Amino acid sequence: TQNDVREGWSATSLICADLWNPGLVHAAMLARPTVLCAPINSASGIVSDDFSNEQNWAINLQFYAMTYGTPVIMTNRFGPEGGSHFWGGSRILGPRGETLAQAEDREMLIHAELSRTAIAKARFELPTHRDADTPLVRDLMLGYR
């Protein structure tokens, strides 16, 4: 769902595994939120020894920020619980996928300044929103029931 957070700014939240489903992300981004909030609950090595949650979350979030010209605010836990270690890595990405702020390997508060002008420019340069053809996607999906 999309929420207005202040005049001219809106946010959509997708929680953890939702961000690994491109269809859910695309559907959420069709509303053109100003910011995507991404609270996750990711531990190191929890998927497999060959899958780096730390590296792959960075790739995933950069891709969506850049593709949709939308800043991403990601939060993750830090510290041990049971046999798992939650790696933290909370970050704020700009509308081109650039890292504006990133937490160190500890609990901490981060902040960054976001610009609606930078968002508009990024969206103009990579027109994912503008070229999204929702009726076409809907029609194509009808064949997969």
Regions found by a protein language model. Give the residues of each.
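CN hydrolase (nitrilase-like) catalytic-core segments centered on the catalytic cysteine
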Residues: 19-110
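Cysteine/selenocysteine-centered motifs that mediate thiol-based redox chemistry or coordinate metal-sulfur cofactors
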Residues: 2-19, 23-34, 38, 45, ...
